[in-house]
Amino acid sequence: HEFSYTKIFAKVSSLFAPLFFNAGYIIEAAIPRFFKGEQDVLFLAKYKSSERQIPEYDSFEVFQNMLVNVPSVNKMQLDNDFSIRKLTIDDVSSMIVVFKQVFETYPFPIFEPLFLTESIQENKTQYFGISCEGNLIAVSSAECDNAEQNAEMTDFAVLPRYRGKRFASHLLSYMENELFKSNFKTFYTISRLKSLSMNRTFYNSGYKYSGTLIKNTQISGNIESMNVWYKNISTNTQE
């Protein structure tokens, strides 16, 4: 009440759902087998303003039309002119250059060298990139919960002149393969509703849509609705 927030958001284990339901929270999305490949997680919300609950209907319509179509799962090889790898502390300055050209604002301080350096050193986040002639042109990251064996696939940024080459798909596939080696069991993302290309990337990569967080995240200068996608992994199947 002190800051006049119009939405309260919580990501909690389904074990605690009754407490939140009793306090007036509603489910906006859910991911099964989120914790160690066993316990589900719920994305809950409590609104203080009816206006905050109104989604961007135009973007919703475009997104739903995408879901009607069968996903395209054709795998493409990365062109020999480009290379993909895991990034290190030595790449931080180049990462910031890419992020600043893609995002006006961001929910986390990805423009700050110290934030990126510490997240890499503490093994909280793994960063990946695509380079051309030694220059970093695309970045993504996996925010890893090593104890619970899940990872958020996020921070996808491709320099404008290199878009249209499915770099996000290549980065996503590379991240999945690297994390699978470390026994991660659930991958997920929270993607901007209005970014049809990113939603299509996860749809075509076998992720399942599980809900939309209405006007949830401050990004690129606005508070936007976000779609939740997930993929459960096991040694034998992908769900």
Predicted regions and their residues:
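Conserved acetyl-CoA-binding loop-helix of GNAT-fold acetyltransferases
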Residues: 1, 158, 164-181, 200, ...
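Conserved GNAT acetyl-CoA-binding A-motif
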Residues: 2-12, 179-191
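Conserved active-site tyrosine of GNAT-family acetyltransferases
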Residues: 16-21, 25, 201-203
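Short, charged, solvent-exposed linker or helix-capping segments at domain edges/interfaces
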Residues: 52-62, 238-239
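Short, cationic low-complexity segments
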Residues: 59-84
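A short beta-loop-alpha structural element at the N-terminal edge
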Residues: 81-95
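A conserved beta-strand-loop-helix scaffold within acyl/acetyltransferase catalytic domains
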Residues: 97-160
